[in-house]
Amino acid sequence: MAKFKQECIFGIRAVMEAIQDEKEIDKVMFRQGIKGDLFQQLFSLVRERQIQFQYVPEEVFKPFAGKNHQGVLAEISPIPYQDINTVVDAVVAEGEMPLILILDRITDVRNLGGIARTAECAGVSAILIPNKNSAKISSDAIKTSAGALYHLPVCREKNLKKTIKELKRRGLTLFAATEKADKFYTEVDMKE
């Protein structure tokens, strides 16, 4: 039986309303074989908004037995995502140089939470993650972050490459980090 680590909403109209109300939806799951005009409207909306979706077997819906889920579930993010440009503008307006942590292909929620905890202590202005191929912000990620994910702005972008180019154009310096580095991050002046 599927276990959900995030808040879920179910039902075609409820999910459509959440999307139209611009709620933070991480993924929409459709029961395999689902059909109908209303489903087609929802599916078009999901594609138009570029929301991640997946077709899943009936077993995924067992925790919602007895509820009229209509073969549709949506995972809702526990935090609001911020716009990266708005965050950068706010930090610059305070007279500081933004320190944005870009996380690419971090797929384990506990790793994401641990990194966020360290990032908050290191003075990071915001965390930037991709829409796809990334761990979702879940209760496990928040717990591991010791609440840092509630304090740090988290930005989610569809195209990291394009966003990185825009950040460079705005004057931000980029640093890469790896576990094979010769220096620890505290030995580098990242706000120079």
Say what each PLM segment does:
Residues 1-192:
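Post-transcriptional modification and biogenesis factors for structured RNAs
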